[in-house]
Regions:
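N-terminal, active-site-proximal structural segment of metallo-dependent hydrolase catalytic domains
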Residues: 1-37, 235
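Active-site regions of metal-assisted phosphoester/phosphodiester hydrolases
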Residues: 1-3, 53-246
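Extracytoplasmic
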Residues: 10, 47, 71-73
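Short acidic/polar active-site loop segments enriched in Thr and Asp
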Residues: 11, 40, 195
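Short, solvent-exposed turn/loop segments enriched in Gly/Ser/Thr/Pro and often Arg
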Residues: 16-19, 45-46, 201-203
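Acidic helix-start/capping segments at beta-turn-to-alpha-helix junctions
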Residues: 18-24, 47-51, 157-161
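Short small/polar-residue motifs
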Residues: 36-41, 56-59
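A short, structured active-site edge motif that brings together acidic residues
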Residues: 38-50
Length: 246
């Protein structure tokens, strides 16, 4: 992680699945390690997700607090070249993970199950999670930031695909099993005017699926690094979205 930040020198970093084991502070440790390499970054205490800024932080906020491992969202504000920026990190609920149901696995237990009978059945599972609750809270806060002249960026692990990626043209690829699914979180973001940065640059999910999960590890068998070893579970569930009124 440190080497990648040193290599890229990003203005902001969003972390997902942060764990402050043994009463430690993960982002403070990262900042200290970067300081040893001559880079100054700022942060604040978080749990489950985390944020770093190369620019002084003017405010921080817990938008969706972590409770019982259902994810979290935090926000910082800063400025870059005189432009006000609000950056959010999001790790959304991993349970009721309905894109597994669409592939014949239960999205909470990851045991094999019969395929759903309909898209409605998939969506019923999907909205049982807290992902949509969290993203609605994000949108509400982001609208306040936008009204105050901030550019808004959200990055993180949504644990849910994009409705732009489960379409008619690829419904028989990647074990979509014929389903065209209007996934909730990305639909809500798009309706609120947010731009999916990757899909903006690469609008065709057939030529650029943009898979972010699972990652490959030649040292491990598929059963050790996947939740659904008998299915093609490749998907894009990690995103950077943005919105500006300027």
């Amino acid at each position: 992680i440190i080497n990648e930040i040193v290599r890229l020198k990003p203005d902001f970093v969003t972390f997902s699945e942060v764990r402050n084991y043994n009463k430690t502070n993960f982002t403070a440790r990262v900042c200290a390690s970067l300081q040893e390499k001559g880079l100054k970054y700022y942060s604040f205490y978080t749990y489950d997700t985390g944020l770093l800024s190369k620019h002084p932080i003017t405010d921080s906020l817990t938008v969706f607090p972590e409770k019982n491992d259902h994810g979290s969202i935090y926000r910082l504000t800063s400025s870059v070249n005189g432009k006000k920026v609000a950056v959010y990190t999001a790790h959304l609920d991993y349970l009721d993970c309905a894109y597994y149901n669409a592939r014949g696995y239960d999205g909470s237990t990851w045991k094999e199950i019969p395929l759903p009978a309909s898209v409605d059945e998939i969506m019923k599972v999907n909205v049982a999670s807290q992902r949509d609750d969290a993203i609605r809270m994000f949108i509400a806060q982001a609208e306040k930031d936008l009204a105050n002249g901030y550019r808004v960026i959200v990055g993180g692990d949504f644990n849910e695909p994009s409705h732009r990626d489960w379409i008619e043209k690829n419904k028989n690829l990647y074990d979509h099993n014929g389903f065209v699914v209007p996934w909730t979180v990305t639909t809500l973001l798009e309706e609120a005017g947010f731009i999916d940065s990757y899909r903006k640059i690469y609008p065709n999910p057939l030529t650029h699926p943009g898979f972010t999960y699972p990652s490959d590890n030649l040292a491990k068998t598929p059963e050790k690094i996947t939740w659904a070893p008998k299915a093609d579970e490749r998907d894009r569930i990690d995103f950077i979205d943005r919105k500006s009124v300027v």
